[in-house]
Amino acid sequence: MTHLSITDQPIDVAAALAAVQTTAAGAVNAFVGTVRNQSGGRPVRRLHYESYDSMALTQLGHVVAQAYEKWPMLQAVAVVHRKGTLELGDVAVVVAVATPHRAESFTACQFIIDTLKQVVTIWKREEYEDGTEWVAAHP
């Protein structure tokens, strides 16, 4: 079971967790990425995310397919990414996975978020007091 979404609406973390709930899983793990108030020592006011949704969702589907290959015991995966303008504290991305045991849930979740940031074409612009800057989504 897989749920992938790019949205301009606030992310419902509970809904992402519910999307991966299954009685076959003894572990549900989630990464929740939020907008922080600084980056590289500079105060951040807000973030702007842009994406070409169909391409980004295709790429995200490939990332999740790789996760299912690496961890065949994966029961479910949900990935929801925001686009548009996000304020400090807003949820930018949620990755949730369900597996029979906890160890695989941690490693699969980390693989998905790390790979997403490397290969999925979602662009991030940081807004500061003195201007804006496009930044790499994968430091």
Question: What does each model-identified segment do?
Answer:
Residues 1-91, 98-139:
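N-terminal, polar/charged subdomain of small-to-medium soluble alpha/beta proteins
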